């Protein structure tokens, strides 16, 4: 195990049996939520931080679920003793969001009324629905107000949604490499993924459970996604124009190293993720827009009362920095004083999973300031 790891952790589950109302008007029950916690909740219950994961993440953000695990949780370098989210000081919560396939109820879960997986009978959900379910978990844990909600990419969308929908429930937010709505280009890449899965003959209109999995479609969808997670510079550094086979450029089935990378990661992804969950989640990403229900984007962002630290990366292709700059400017126009750090990086969108040192310094300083402010109230 790595040094300064939170060590062995157990994924916990809670099932809410009351009706859950989706933004679409659909109702579902029961709903199970998978979550993990790190650190200790203090007596005042004012040191709790909610970490929100990205598109294909899970509740397992730090530590190890088993002594045999080869890798720790997906943000282990950021969560633990002395790290950005210091477990000696804060109580960290990470839950698998609604519709995913890592323990929280989603399309692959069993519909109790039929005894079969929901498939496409599962309601279309939104980022706001994810946040509403997270709030049920926070209420269940007896936490009145979160010290902070933080996350990268789609996790940052959830942090923003928390601040807009439940402004009274968090003292601060740290949205990283994210936006209040995605660009048409991002929707276009998601469309490729959607088309690839739905055109796979094994998808069978979402009714593939217990049958042949739509592996090719999901692998291609992941390949398209991977392109947006990197940058031109990171592609050059990692692969250049190197050829991966010995047949030479005139071998019809020869391929470049970058092709090999996309193919390998695409198919590896199919071993751990559900195709229907992927379709539902990218749908939630596409339709996410903070302005919905508030008249305008400016009005929605004006609802944010939480102290805010925004982090972006100069080479982010999927969520360009100008999207955060727009939010920051709107907040300033509403008399707020958000902090914004634009980190120089060649890693592209994936920088939030790789640029640990630069993120850690500004996050630790920001959280310490918020913690002291709350403690002195």
UniProtKB/Swiss-Prot annotation:
Q: List the catalytic residues.
A: 153 (nucleophile), 316, 349
Residue ranges occupied by any AB hydrolase-1 domain in the UniProt entry: 47-355
Where found? Answer: Cytoplasm
Enzyme class per UniProt: transferase
Highest taxon, organism lineage: Bacteria
**Which positions bind substrate?**
222, 350
Listed GO cellular component terms? cytoplasm
Role noted for this protein: Transfers an acetyl group from acetyl-CoA to L-homoserine, forming acetyl-L-homoserine.
Q: How does it assemble?
A: Homodimer.
Q: Which family does it belong to?
A: Belongs to the AB hydrolase superfamily. MetX family.
Q: What is this protein called?
A: Homoserine O-acetyltransferase
Species whose genome carries this gene? Deferribacter desulfuricans (strain DSM 14783 / JCM 11476 / NBRC 101012 / SSM1)
The coding gene here is: metXA
């Amino acid at each position: 195990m790595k040094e300064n790891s939170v060590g062995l952790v157990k994924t916990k589950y809670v099932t809410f049996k009351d009706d859950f109302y989706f933004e679409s008007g659909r109702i579902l029950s029961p709903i199970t939520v998978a979550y993990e916690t790190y650190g200790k909740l203090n007596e005042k219950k004012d040191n709790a931080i909610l970490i929100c994961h990205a598109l294909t993440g899970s509740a397992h953000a730090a530590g190890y679920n088993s002594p045999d695990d080869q890798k720790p949780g997906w943000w282990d370098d950021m969560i633990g003793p002395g790290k950005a989210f210091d477990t000696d000081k804060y109580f960290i919560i990470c839950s698998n969001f609604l519709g995913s396939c890592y323990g929280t109820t989603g399309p692959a879960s069993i519909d109790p009324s039929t005894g079969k997986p929901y498939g496409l009978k599962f309601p279309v959900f939104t980022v706001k629905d994810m946040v509403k379910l997270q709030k049920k978990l926070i209420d269940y844990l007896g936490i009145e107000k979160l010290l902070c909600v933080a996350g990268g990419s789609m996790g940052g969308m959830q942090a923003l949604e928390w601040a807009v929908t439940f402004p009274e429930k968090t003292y601060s937010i740290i949205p990283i490499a994210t936006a209040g709505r995605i660009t048409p280009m991002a929707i276009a890449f998601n469309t490729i993924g959607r088309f690839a899965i739905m055109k796979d003959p094994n998808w069978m209109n979402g009714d593939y459970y217990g049958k042949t999995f739509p592996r090719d479609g999901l692998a291609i969808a992941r390949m398209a996604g991977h392109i947006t997670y990197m940058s031109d510079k990171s592609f050059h550094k990692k692969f250049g124009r190197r050829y991966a086979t010995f047949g030479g450029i005139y071998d019809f089935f020869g391929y470049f190293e970058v092709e090999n990378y996309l193919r390998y990661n695409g198919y590896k992804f199919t071993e751990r993720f559900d195709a229907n969950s992927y379709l539902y989640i990218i749908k939630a990403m596409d339709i996410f827009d903070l302005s919905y229900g508030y008249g305008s984007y400016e009005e929605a962002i004006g609802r944010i009362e939480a102290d805010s630290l925004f982090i972006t990366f100069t080479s982010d292709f999927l969520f360009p920095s100008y999207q955060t700059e727009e939010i920051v400017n709107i907040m300033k126009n509403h008399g707020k004083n958000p902090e914004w750090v634009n980190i120089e990086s060649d890693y592209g969108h994936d920088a939030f999973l790789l640029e640990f040192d630069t993120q850690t310094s500004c996050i630790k300083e920001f959280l310490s300031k918020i913690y002291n402010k709350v403690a002195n109230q």
